[in-house]
């Protein structure tokens, strides 16, 4: 669990250096978001989006660029980011990206209005871009999952085979985000209660249940970790050959390699989708799935979590049956 905290502390130091080069209002905005427990990734994205907007604004007083902003300024900016030039070609910017940038500005101007930097909020006269949703979900079927594990067994190098198998199994068997998986420390794994304590998106601390097959895979990897990598009894659970914490990029590379034979693009997040879809296909209710995945969208999940403990165990067992 502390792995994520270590990473966030390093990132915050980098952000502090960046903020020192920006107008003071950015530091105030960052502190305002931090007090409201926004995730570091969210705060970083919001700052970057507002900096981009600041550069768009045509004003000599760059430190107080926000004071001359009107709803027309916002509309012109949103129009300007519909397209961009990449390698000499004009490409369309996705609705979701434009909506994210609008949300960043909306939060920024809400902050400005609350703190009396501005008299009126121009965002109130603008509209969030509509996002055209594609309801097609890419995920792996049980047969495809089996083929991926076979590929790891047949092709992975001996010293990383059990590590890679365990990472894929953990993504499929728990639905954890890859950022949470790489930040797990050995001491976060509780073999008595079969749980892993993680810090997830939005700084949520959760105890994730795992079943017997995954338990055995973790134990096998921990032996290899000690034998092949001279791993310490504490610290990062998943390490590279250089003994450092495995990165998100490294896991993305592993997933890409072991799923290359499938006729679909599988990313680490698709392991999460696969976990959800296979639970759904086995008849697990939506509240239980939302609770296991840590989704905020199902607002009643928190209320019913304790009542679904047994269902969550059954759901975990369903996912565990995919790991052979």
Predicted segment positions?
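Conserved catalytic core of the tyrosine transesterase superfamily
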Residues: 1-324
